[in-house]
A protein has these predicted regions:
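Active-site acidic/histidine proton-transfer and metal-coordination neighborhood
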Residues: 7, 17, 54, 95-189, ...
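Alpha-helical scaffolding segments of alpha/beta enzyme cores, especially the outer helices
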Residues: 42-46, 70-78, 104-115, 135, ...
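Acidic-and-aromatic substrate-binding clefts and catalytic sites of carbohydrate-active enzymes
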Residues: 32-38, 58-69, 90-104, 128-132, ...
Length: 286
């Protein structure tokens, strides 16, 4: 699935002054989901050894990869990693009692996020049954405002992570417009997935300008030059990230996450290629 993102790059407040003093490149752990399922501690050590400094979590269900918040935080510390963000679901699917979602157990999710040092929580994906009409999106927007208020009290910023379906007309309207216009900008910002934005035929930089300062997080993943527009390693595809990175200040971006939902071989090999391109080519454009 595409609802988790990868690799995080931290930009401190110096970005507002045009400089970047602290560079920590991170990774969205969904990219290495099979490795995390088998050996989370070992996988995190390998990630750190590649030069990553941050990770973005996924799959929280009351625990982080089977660990309570305190244990997971200890593992991160041992590996020299921090987790500034994590992915969560809305929760209006199945039996509608899905722990760690906006609609069920949100307060605990926020408390656990704070306990491990997260400063962002991102709504990763809307299930098809959650988004059948514009009325659904209006209800989601209202619920995101409430969830964002809970986050704010804990010193955490709520974000919404897009795919391409939010840009497809529904009931004569564009769902992304509803999510943007009917949420409080102070309570709900965006984690813009630049792959899905591009696949939807939108220009990321135009969105940065339209929602200036509100796109706090990016998902950086590349698209190959085939009719299917598949995922590929960053720097191996057709998305002009050198151009995009030059507009980080307009976006308001604080972290970016390199992601590859599907890899041709070992995911660890793919993220190794991606971080090399980020280090050699993209950072200088910030």
């Amino acid at each position: 699935m595409a609802w988790v993102a990868a690799g995080s790059f931290f930009i401190n407040d110096a970005l507002a002054l045009g400089g970047v003093k602290d560079k920590k490149i991170g990774v969205q752990l969904y990219t290495v989901r099979d490795d995390m399922a088998k050996d989370p501690r070992g996988t995190l050590k390998k990630i750190a050894a590649m030069g990553f400094g941050e990770v973005e979590n996924f799959g929280y269900n009351g625990k982080f990869f089977g660990m309570e918040a305190s244990e997971y935080k200890q593992v991160l510390d041992e590996c020299g990693l921090v987790a500034p963000s994590g992915h969560y679901l809305y929760g209006n699917f199945g039996n509608k009692q899905n722990p760690g979602t906006v609609l069920f157990g949100w307060e605990k999710a926020v408390a656990d996020a704070k306990a491990i040092g997260q400063t962002y929580m991102a709504i990763a994906f809307l299930m098809p049954e959650e988004r059948t009409s514009i009325a659904d999106y209006k209800k989601i927007a209202a619920d995101l405002n409430k969830a964002g208020a809970v986050c704010k009290k804990a010193g955490i910023q709520l974000c919404y992570h897009n795919h391409d379906f939010e840009f497809q007309e529904l009931d004569g309207q564009i769902p992304f417009d509803i999510l943007a216009n009917e949420t409080d900008p102070a309570l709900v910002k965006f984690e813009l997935d630049l792959f899905w934005v591009s696949k939807a035929g939108k220009d990321p930089i135009a969105l940065f300008k339209q929602y200036k300062g509100r796109v706090a997080l990016w998902h950086v993943k590349d698209m190959d030059n085939t009719p299917n527009k598949n995922f590929t390693e960053v720097g191996s595809g057709v998305i002009d990230y050198a151009r995009i990175f030059k507009h980080a200040k307009t976006s308001g971006m604080k972290h970016f996450f390199v992601e590859q939902d599907v890899c041709p071989g070992a995911p660890l090999d793919s993220i190794r290629k991606s971080i090399a391109h980020v280090q050699s080519t993209l950072l200088k454009n910030l």
